[in-house]
Structure formats: structure tokens, C-alpha cells
Curated annotation (Swiss-Prot):
UniProt subcellular location: Endoplasmic reticulum; Membrane
Chief location bin: endoplasmic reticulum
Membrane topology, as annotated: Multi-pass membrane protein
InterPro entries: 5TM-prot_SCHPO (IPR018291)
Keywords: Endoplasmic reticulum, Membrane, Transmembrane, Transmembrane helix
Family designation: Belongs to the UPF0742 family.
Record's protein name: Uncharacterized membrane protein SPAC977.01
Intervals, Lumenal compartment: 92, 192-194, 267-316
Transmembrane segments: 71-91, 93-113, 171-191, 195-215, 246-266
Taxonomy, superkingdom: Eukaryota
Length: 316
């Protein structure tokens, strides 16, 4: 309860334990009491509307998850095993490691940090420690934005062959990193100052830029696959074909799996939808870059680049 005395209209904002904000307009002097009442009787069934889909109480509060727990643990275990094997192969071929693979290692670190912060956010989201929640959420948003733009930079550079079959000019890498840092700085300021219009513009641009990057990369890879000269080893052609197939699969499967996940969420079990979403996120964000840049192909690519350079020198 609270008291208000004044001549003009005022706004009182309160917060409950679930971090849901309520706004009450006040234009009269007096004492006020704010309370909440349940919309259903104890034991009654209710359906919660989430993103247009009706989810029953049993789907959300069912403690007997059973097989879903084992599937989630197995999924996470498979991710850790895959990443451990990939990092081990990087260490094994450390003498001929490519710059693109170093970028992937940095990207994996950002992805792991991002997932850790997401777990911290889920821990505080239903608690009263809203300050810690806001801090975790702000850091999570910045790291997620940084990770996403590093991923797009990696896609473009791989399609152009930088750090793989072509050397990376220093100015090009510095420009790319500078652009990413500048975008992250503006995005952070918009979040810190609560300038939501700027963050919404950034989100809108991201939805438009991401498909354009994929289409450009696929078209450039098609050109690369059809322009392999006679002096180049077949390993380069195989590498670009493998990259092209992975790019096309990710670009085509992303909207289809998103639609499938929404159908499962609304009609079957939301936990299955979460597992499918996590699995595809791992495939797109981790397995895809690790697959096209697997360190076991480094020796063949390095030999191929030397052969091509020697052939060009002989022609001159």
C-alpha cells in the first residue's frame, strides 16, 4: 500500500517477485492498496499463451521429465566431445594452423561464455535480485552481439578464401575487427542509456544483413568452384565444394527447422522444441565452422597453395 498527495496526474510503478512491472495512473489524493488475485481456482487447469501457442500447465510444471533430461545431457556431452576432438586436432597440427582456425577458437570461447551468461540469467530471472539480472543480461546482449558479428565476418572471409587459401592482409583484418568493435560500442551505449530505438534498428538491420551475407557467400563460392585452374591441386576444389554444401545446407535448413520447432512447441512438447533448437544452434554456430575448417585438411591445403604459387612463378 502507499499514499499519494498532489494536484497533477502521477505514475506509480511497482515490481513483484517475478519481475513483471505494473503501471498505475493516479490523479486523486488518497491512500491506495495494490493487490493481485488468482484468475483460476486451486487445482484448476490453465493454458499459458506463449508466442501464439497454447501451452498447458502440465507441459511447464511437469517434474517427471525422464527421457528429456537424458537427451539434454547426451546432447551436451556430444557437443563437448566434438569440441574437445577439434581442439586436440588443432594442437596436433599447430605448426600449420590457419588464421581462420584461430578465429574459430576465439569464436568458440565467446560462444561458451555466452551460454554461461545465459544460464546465469535463467537463475536470476525468477528471483528478486533484479540488479544482478540486469547486469548479466546487459553483458549477455553485448557478447551475443559480438559473437554474431564475428560469425558473419568469419563467413565472409571464408567465402573469399582469406586465412585459408589466401593470405590475410593486415589492413583487412584490422578494418573488420574495428567495424565489429564500433558496432558493439554503439549497441552497448544504446542498452546502457535505454535507447531502445537504436537497439531495435540494429536488430532490424541484422535480420536484413544476415541473409544477404549468406547469399553473397554462396554466389562467390559457386564462382570459386567453377574457376579452379589446371595448376591447382584438387584439394582446393574439394574444400570449396565442401564449404559450398555446408553454406547451402545452413541457409536452406534454418527457416525450415525454425518453422518445425514452432509446430512442435505448439502441438507436442515444448522440451522437444528446445532440444531441436539447441541442436540446430550447435550445428549452425559450432559444427558448421569446425567442419569446413577441420585441421586434418591443413596439410593438403598448405601443399596446394605452395604448388599453385610455384606454378604461377614458372608461368612468369
Amino acid at each position: 500500500s502507499f499514499a499519494y498527495s498532489g494536484n497533477s496526474e502521477s505514475v506509480w510503478t511497482g515490481e513483484n517477485i517475478t519481475s513483471i512491472w505494473k503501471t498505475i495512473l493516479i490523479n486523486e489524493t488518497g491512500s491506495y492498496c495494490v493487490a493481485a488475485r488468482p484468475m483460476t481456482m486451486d487445482g484448476a487447469e490453465f493454458n499459458l499463451d506463449l508466442m501464439g501457442y497454447s501451452v498447458s500447465e502440465d507441459q511447464i510444471n511437469n517434474d517427471e521429465i525422464g527421457i528429456w533430461n537424458y537427451i539434454s545431457v547426451a546432447e551436451m556431452g556430444g557437443v563437448l566431445l566434438f569440441l574437445s576432438y577439434w581442439i586436440w586436432t588443432c594442437l596436433h597440427f599447430s605448426k600449420i594452423i590457419f588464421p581462420a582456425q584461430k578465429v574459430i577458437c576465439l569464436y568458440i570461447f565467446l560462444f561458451a561464455l555466452n551460454q554461461t551468461l545465459q544460464e546465469c540469467i535463467e537463475e536470476y530471472v525468477f528471483s528478486s535480485e533484479c540488479i544482478k539480472y540486469r547486469q548479466f543480461y546487459s553483458v549477455y546482449e553485448i557478447i551475443d552481439f559480438l559473437r554474431t558479428n564475428f560469425y558473419r565476418l568469419f563467413v565472409i572471409y571464408c567465402a573469399l578464401g582469406f586465412g585459408i587459401t589466401r593470405t590475410v592482409p593486415k589492413y583487412l583484418m584490422i578494418k573488420g575487427i574495428s567495424i565489429v568493435i564500433a558496432l558493439c560500442s554503439v549497441y552497448w551505449i544504446s542498452l546502457y542509456k535505454d535507447v531502445y530505438v537504436v537497439s531495435e534498428i540494429f536488430d532490424m538491420i541484422q535480420y536484413e544483413v544476415s541473409p544477404a551475407i549468406w547469399v553473397y557467400s554462396i554466389c562467390h563460392l559457386l564462382k570459386q568452384c567453377t574457376s579452379v585452374t589446371t595448376y591447382e591441386n584438387a584439394s582446393k576444389a574439394r574444400f570449396f565444394r565442401r564449404m559450398l554444401n555446408a553454406f547451402i545446407f545452413i541457409f536452406c535448413a534454418s527457416p525450415m527447422l525454425h518453422y518445425l520447432s514452432n509446430i512442435i512447441f505448439g502441438n507436442f512438447d515444448y522440451r522437444l522444441s528446445v532440444i531441436i533448437g539447441d541442436l540446430f544452434t550447435f550445428m549452425e554456430k559450432i559444427a558448421f565452422p569446425c567442419y569446413i575448417m577441420f585441421p586434418t585438411h591443413n596439410e593438403a591445403l598448405a601443399y596446394n597453395r605452395n604448388v599453385a604459387e610455384e606454378a604461377q612463378e614458372k608461368m612468369i
